[in-house]
């Protein structure tokens, strides 16, 4: 291996930044991910894959509630990516950043893409848990550019 660690090499791969959100009662749990990948893009059984830390409260909420949203952040939402990348208490549903659908999907206002998902499977034999989810609905705002994460920095394509 080169002088760079594998972690350094992989951090140089540019990725979109997403915020996973789960509703439980009057609370919204959220965390930032950069590991979102499509697994099946068919219209009848669209599936995505992502990873979360084993001790993730959001992961536990996904398994319990089954329904959640993945919000691909827009270029101007770096503040949300930073906020949700740290440990914090859940938000209350009434907070202005959320649009709640059917009491189970929390959409970030002005996200570039929103995927409403149902938990399908989990693979827990790795250092991080790998989640498979079925996409039940989706939307994209093509007028917004995505927020990108590369080499441990956020990149705003608008600047």
Which residue stretches match the model-derived regions?
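Basic, polyanion-binding surface patches
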Residues: 1-159
């Amino acid at each position: 291996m080169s002088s760079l660690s594998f972690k350094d090499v992989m951090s140089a791969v540019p990725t979109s930044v997403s915020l996973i959100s789960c509703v439980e009662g009057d609370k919204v749990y959220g965390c930032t991910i950069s590991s979102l990948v499509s697994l099946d893009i068919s219209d009848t059984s669209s599936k995505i894959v992502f990873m979360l830390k084993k001790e993730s409260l959001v992961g536990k909420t996904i398994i319990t509630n089954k329904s959640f949203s993945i919000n691909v952040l827009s270029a101007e939402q770096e503040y949300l990516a930073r906020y949700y990348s740290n440990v914090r208490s859940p938000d209350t549903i009434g907070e202005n950043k959320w649009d709640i659908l059917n009491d189970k999907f929390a959409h970030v206002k002005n996200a570039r893409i929103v995927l409403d998902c149902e938990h399908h499977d989990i693979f827990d034999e790795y250092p991080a848990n790998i989640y498979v989810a079925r996409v039940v609905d989706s939307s994209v705002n093509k007028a917004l550019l995505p927020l990108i994460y590369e080499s441990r920095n956020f990149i705003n394509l608008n600047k």
